[in-house]
Each structure stands twice: as C-alpha cells, then as structure tokens.
C-alpha cells in the first residue's frame, strides 16, 4: 500500500497547456463544493492549527490547561505530554507536507497537483479557475469513485491515527464524564438518560456560559474526528475489494499507480476536449464564415455564367438585325401582377434594355428613354429623342473592299448617339434570309438613313470617319474593357450637354 519503489508514468500536461478561463463556471454545485470543501474546510484546519499551538504553549510553558473550568478525565501529567506530543507531531507533519507540496506546486503539473492534497488545496484557494479544472477531472463509474475515495482516505491516515486520535480520545473521555455520566468523574457506565442530558446542558449554560462554550467546541471537534474515523474505516473495508480487483486485472502494481494513470488519462481527455472546443470556436468565427463566403461567390459566378449562356449572344460577325431577333423577351412581374410591356421605338440603346434591368448595359442607362413607373399603359409617356441619321453600313457590307473604299472616300460615316429603326420588328420579314441573299446579290438595299444631332462637334466627325463601326464591341459585359470607337464621343457629348 505504501510502496513507492515502482515506476509509474505521470502526465506532463500543465496548467500552461490549458486556457483555464474556459473551465471557469459558477454552477451551484461547483460553488457549493468550493465554499464547503475548500474555503470552509481549510479555514477550519487553520483555526484548529492555531488552537493546537495555543494549547501546546499553555501546557509546556505555563504547565496548565487552556481553561481551568473543565478538567480532563486523565491525570494532568499524562494528559499534558500526550496532548503536547500529538500537537508537535501534527506540526512536523504539516511542515513536511508543505515542503513537498510546494515542490509539486511549482511544477504546475495537473496530475501531480491533483494527487497531492497540499498543492491541490493551495491551487484551489489561490485560483478558482484551477479548482474548476480539478472539479472537471471526472471519476467515471463506481469503481473509479471507490478507488479514488480509498486512496485519499488511506493517504491521510497517518495524521488521523497518530496526531488526532490520541487527543480526541482524551476529549471524548472528558465529555463522557461531564455530560453523559450521572456523577462527574465517577463510573462511566452509569449513563445519563436523554432527558437528563438535555437538562444538564441547560443547567451548565445558565450557570456558566464559558463552560458551555468550551464543551460545545470540544463536542464539535469530537464529532468531526468521529466522521473522519468512520470514513477511514469505510476506506479500509473498500481497500479489500479495490486491491483484489487491481491484482486480478494484473495491469497495475499498486493503488497509487492506478490512481496516477487514471488521473493522467482523465487529464488527456480534458485537454483534448478543451482543444476541440477552441477549434470549434475558431471554425465558427473564421473558417466556417470564410467557407460560406466562398460558396456564395461560387454560386454567384454560376448564376452569372448561366444567365450569360442563356442570353445566347452571337459572335462579332453577326449583324445588328440578327442580334435584335435573338434578343430575349422579358416581362416584368410584380406583387400586383404582370406589368404591360412598353412599346418603344426600337433604337440601338432601347433594344438592349427594353425595360429589363437584367440586360441593362452601362450606356443604356444614359441614352435610353426614361421609364415611367406606372401600371397603366395609357398614362405612359415616352420622352422625345432626337434621332440622327448615320449612313453606316453593316459589318457584312464591308466584305467587299471596293465598297469600303467608296464609303471611306465619300466620308459617309457619321458619329451618332442613337440609331432608330423606323419600322417595327414585326414588319421585318425573315431578316436572316435577306442577309444570306445579300451575299449572293450585289444589289442589296442600304439601311435607312439615320439623322445625327447637330451638337456633335466637327472633331468627333472627322475622327469617326476613319473608323468602321462595329456594334458588338459596345455590348460586351466586361466593365474593364476600354471604350473605344464611337462610344468615346458619345460619352463626351453626353457629359458636355
């Protein structure tokens, strides 16, 4: 039981490896254990230690008791050296435990400080969070609880047997002779009845208050000692089953090794649970938020790509008329029901928008006609837009170099901010077939002339004459591309006006 020659492994986890503030709690059971088991019990031990020192000084220096009212049952010479020897032995044991406990306390090791009573009590008194850590080292199952109880009771049995028991026996005999027996200091077998015991206590309290207080303190200390003796005897009985189980398992060489290994495993589990909690908090605060953000970005990118593919824009070689025919039709829907679609004159900027914010470009918001927010088609008024004519051939018309040279020499390219088709789209029959027929026939009719605004300066006209107008470059949805060609003059003109 008290063999320390075997080797056992001690967990190296210290309080520095833990964030002890995470274990701090103010549950009712935890606070109650701290008040009773730490503050109250250690305060009582300190008071008893001071009382023992005072009694020892009175016995050895003044050769008298601390009180002259109640005399001990044994003769003074025997009681004097018996009390003095027990008090001195308890002081020596306390100093030894303090030295060993301070060495363990400085290590900060959780397992070692938990096993040592002095270091555990010192950590608990100085830091409530460390007490919460000790309190969370769980003892799983009835076997572990019984083994821990047996170990700690047998560990403190030296002080109980050799320093406290002799003194409490003398106190018990004194209390027995004064309170329980009929006549003081006579036959101890002649006991007082329960009614006579109550009446005796009342009589002592009425005649001498100091004697009643001293008897009460002696009775209180004797009851505490009796409880410790009962726990010690219970631990001795439990040790039979505990050692039988340990020897039968053949895993541990003794009770101390089993306790140290079990505490080490519990500390490992406690540290792992604390690290998992910290990782979960970190993931919740940073990692999970970032992953959701990236998922949102991916979802937005997929939606943009899907909407762009559904639009099915043609290549750069397609004509503007084909783009108009391929334009997706949009009908707005609101909580009040479907909104009638505006019938607007199809211009170069209006066919891009047509009242649909999904297909709005950066220049259609500037050049398009204002939209009147109303659900009555009769109240809708369209702003007047000054139309300008530009003799601009389509991209397919420039396949012949002769036509391009004639147009360039004649200076027919004009700057424009809008281009109007004077006929509705429905009146254009089979535009694609006409374009295909134009490739075979050289005499294709030219598009209707467009009028230009007179506010365009001559410098813009001269610069635009040397360019070939390509409509598709104006409808790219990439905002980082430079705006070149006719759109530069359009922006300058709009800002100027």
Swiss-Prot record:
The keyword Transmembrane helix applies. The chain crosses the membrane at residues 30-50, 81-101, 217-237. GO terms for biological process: potassium ion transmembrane transport. Disruption phenotype: Leads to high-affinity Ca(2+) influx system (HACS) deficiency. Causes a large increase of cell death in response to mating pheromone, when PRM6/KCH2 is also deleted. Residues 420-469 are annotated as: Disordered. It is found in: Vacuole membrane; Cell membrane. It is a multi-pass membrane protein. Pfam families: KCH. The modification Phosphoserine is found at residues 291, 319. Residues 451-465 have a biased composition (Polar residues). Induction: Expression is strongly induced during the response to alpha-factor. Coiled coil: none annotated. One of its GO terms (cellular component) is mating projection. GO terms for molecular function: potassium ion transmembrane transporter activity. Low affinity potassium transporter that, with PRM6/KCH2, participates in high-affinity Ca(2+) influx system (HACS) activation during the response to mating pheromone. Directly promotes K(+) influx and HACS may electrochemically respond to this K(+) influx. KCH1 and KCH2 act at the apex of the calcium signaling pathway that is used for survival during prolonged exposures to mating pheromones. This is Low affinity K(+) transporter 1.
């Amino acid at each position: 039981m008290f063999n320390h020659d075997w080797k056992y492994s001690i967990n190296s986890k210290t309080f520095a490896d833990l964030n002890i503030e995470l274990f701090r709690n103010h549950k009712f059971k935890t606070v109650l254990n701290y008040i009773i088991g730490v503050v109250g019990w250690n305060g009582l031990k300190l008071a008893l230690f001071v009382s023992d020192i005072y009694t020892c000084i009175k016995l050895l220096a003044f050769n008298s008791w601390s009180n002259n009212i109640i005399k001990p049952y044994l003769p003074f010479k025997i009681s004097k050296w018996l009390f003095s020897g027990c008090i001195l032995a308890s002081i020596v044991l306390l100093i030894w435990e303090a030295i060993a406990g301070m060495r363990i306390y400085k290590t900060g090791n959780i397992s070692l400080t938990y096993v040592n009573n002095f270091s555990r009590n010192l950590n608990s008194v100085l830091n409530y969070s460390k007490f919460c850590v000790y309190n969370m080292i769980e003892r799983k199952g009835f076997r572990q609880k019984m083994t821990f109880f047996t170990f700690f009771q047998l560990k403190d049995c030296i002080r109980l047997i050799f320093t406290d028991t002799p003194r409490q026996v003398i106190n018990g005999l004194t209390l027995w002779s004064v309170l329980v027996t009929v006549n003081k200091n006579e036959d101890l077998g002649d006991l007082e009845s329960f009614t006579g015991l109550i009446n005796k206590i009342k009589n002592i309290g009425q005649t001498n208050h100091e004697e009643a207080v001293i008897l009460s303190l002696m009775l209180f200390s004797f009851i505490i000692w009796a409880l410790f003796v009962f726990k010690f005897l219970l631990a001795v009985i439990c040790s039979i089953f505990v050692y039988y189980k340990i020897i039968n398992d053949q895993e541990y060489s003794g009770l101390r090794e089993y306790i140290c290994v079990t505490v080490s495993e519990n500390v490992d589990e406690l540290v792992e649970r604390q690290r998992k909690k910290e990782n979960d908090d970190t993931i919740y605060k940073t990692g999970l938020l970032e992953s959701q953000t990236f998922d949102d970005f991916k979802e937005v990118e997929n939606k943009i790509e899907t909407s762009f593919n559904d639009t099915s824009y043609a290549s750069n070689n397609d004509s503007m008329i084909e783009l108009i025919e391929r334009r997706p039709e949009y009908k707005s829907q609101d909580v009040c029901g479907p909104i009638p679609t505006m019938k607007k004159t199809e211009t170069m900027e209006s066919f891009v928008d047509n009242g649909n914010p999904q297909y709005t470009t950066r220049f259609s918001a500037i050049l398009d006609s204002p939209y009147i927010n109303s659900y009555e088609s009769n109240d809708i008024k369209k702003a007047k837009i000054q139309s300008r004519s530009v003799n601009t051939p389509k991209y397919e018309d420039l396949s012949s170099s002769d036509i391009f040279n004639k147009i360039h020499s004649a200076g027919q390219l004009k700057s424009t901010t809008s281009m109007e088709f004077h006929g509705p789209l429905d009146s254009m029959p089979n535009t694609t077939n006409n374009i295909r027929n134009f490739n075979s026939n050289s005499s294709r009719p030219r598009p209707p002339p467009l009028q230009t605004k007179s506010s365009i300066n001559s410098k813009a006209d001269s610069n635009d004459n040397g360019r070939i107008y390509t409509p598709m470059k104006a409808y790219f949805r990439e905002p980082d591309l430079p705006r070149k060609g006719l759109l530069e003059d359009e922006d300058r003109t709009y800002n100027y006006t």
